[in-house]
Amino acid sequence: MKIVIQRVKEASVSIDGKIAGAIDQGLLLLVGIGPDDQAEDIDYAVRKISHMRIFSDSEGKMNRSIQDIEGSVLSISQFTLYADTKKGNRPAFTGAAKPDKASQLYNSFNDHLEELVPVKRGVFGADMQVSLINDGPVTIILDTKNR
């Protein structure tokens, strides 16, 4: 799994002009599923994201987690994180998991994360418009294959 983690003041996702999900302070996650991903990748990602200390404490140090601040997550499926740009000018996305597998793992990831923090979701495979106000900005890339 490849996940772009962005600390946000607020974020929302719209589909066909209608808001499908919105959060206040928390994390916007762009979630890509690879062909070799499985349950252990989900467990690792959920553990890291829910405990990652990237929110400021009273002294301004990044010392608090999403759970500590009682924040929320907006999770967006993002197969383009597996783009291959080596040849030509048009990215290839053959490195991403097939849609059936990716959808199942994406939903499982969100279900597991939702046991720890509130999660709003985009719609897998939909054309979405994502709006956000970055906080910091703080943007971290998590790759479950690089542990």
Curated annotation (Swiss-Prot):
A single GO BP: D-amino acid catabolic process
GO cellular component, one term: cytoplasm
Motif stretch (Gly-cisPro motif, important for rejection of L-amino acids): 136-137
EC number of the protein: 3.1.1.96
Family, as annotated: Belongs to the DTD family.
Gene3D superfamilies tied to this protein: D-tyrosyl-tRNA(Tyr) deacylase
Name of the protein in its database record: D-aminoacyl-tRNA deacylase
Known partners and oligomeric status: Homodimer.
Keywords: Cytoplasm, Hydrolase, RNA-binding, tRNA-binding
Gene: dtd
Enzyme class: hydrolase
Cytoplasm in keyword set: yes
Residue stretches spanning the membrane: none
Chief site of localization: cytoplasm
Catalytic reactions of this protein: glycyl-tRNA(Ala) + H2O = tRNA(Ala) + glycine + H(+); a D-aminoacyl-tRNA + H2O = a tRNA + a D-alpha-amino acid + H(+)
Domain notes: A Gly-cisPro motif from one monomer fits into the active site of the other monomer to allow specific chiral rejection of L-amino acids.
